[in-house]
Amino acid sequence: MLNEDSEWLDHVRKGNREFVELEQHHRRLERELNTLLKRRILPADDEVRKKTLQKEKLAAKDRMNEILRQSKLAETTH
């Protein structure tokens, strides 16, 4: 999901509850999206749901990346 080394991710997970919650939320969205994408034909309401899930998933990933950037910046300034 993220292009960070696992030790750094573990460090951030231990120190940032929001990151952990976002990571879990991102996984739930991924599972729900995959379930929708397995269907051959999506009714209009499922198409809307798919787009909503994709946007939420991207927003979660963007926020997680921002947390990682802030954490690295904080580490380098101390």
Predicted regions and their residues:
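Extended, charge-rich alpha-helical interface modules
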Residues: 1-78
